[in-house]
């Protein structure tokens, strides 16, 4: 919204002309018509005073997004690649209004590994400045090959039964027990454990 003030030495009011009063100005400097309407007292005291229309120059500056609130919807899981939320997933609000998506660009940082990532919007067109929000990249769940055909000797413990890389018995000191097939809990952990969940399985 634009506020109009006048510098005339005569008493009266300034208003936007009917031809431009509903115009929403964009960033830049433009000419708009303004109407000066003298008050009743002014008309009595000045014979030549009448309603006057004049072009005035109006400069509209871009609005800063620095205080905007940025939120990100959706879920994100580690893929090994940098992830930038789509425009539809990003909402920017300023002074209670949602900023149109074509008024800013979107970038992200710390957005490859699992954990908290940052999304930054940069104003363009009618907006300037930047604002940031966060989103979470969750750990991925691996799909390891499940060890099979494991064999143990009576009287031994689980730690005597070797497992493929990444797998470990949950209770390595436990006895394998009597002869026969039995399940024992084991956990698979990726080398890049910060980005992957562990996988637990009962192995036989």
Language-model regions, residue ranges each:
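Solvent-exposed beta-strand/loop surfaces, strongest in extracytoplasmic domains of secreted
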Residues: 1-204
């Amino acid at each position: 919204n634009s506020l109009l003030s006048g510098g005339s030495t005569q008493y009266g009011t300034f208003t936007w002309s009917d031809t431009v009063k509903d115009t929403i100005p964009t960033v830049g400097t433009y000419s708009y018509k303004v109407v000066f309407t003298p008050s009743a007292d002014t008309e009595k005291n000045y014979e030549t005073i009448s309603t006057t229309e004049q072009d005035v120059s109006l400069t509209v500056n871009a609005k800063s997004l620095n205080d905007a609130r940025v939120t990100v919807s959706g879920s994100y899981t580690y893929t090994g690649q940098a992830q930038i939320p789509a425009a539809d997933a990003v909402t920017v609000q300023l002074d209670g209004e949602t900023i149109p998506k074509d008024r800013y660009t979107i970038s992200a940082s710390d957005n490859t590994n699992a954990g908290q990532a940052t999304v930054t919007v940069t104003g363009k067109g009618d907006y300037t400045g930047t604002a940031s929000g966060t989103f979470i990249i969750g750990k991925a769940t691996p799909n390891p090959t499940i060890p099979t055909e494991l064999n143990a000797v009576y009287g031994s413990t689980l730690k005597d039964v070797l497992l493929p890389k990444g797998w470990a018995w949950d209770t390595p000191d436990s006895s394998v027990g009597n002869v026969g097939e039995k399940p024992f809990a084991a956990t698979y952990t990726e080398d890049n454990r910060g980005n992957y969940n562990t996988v637990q399985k009962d192995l036989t």
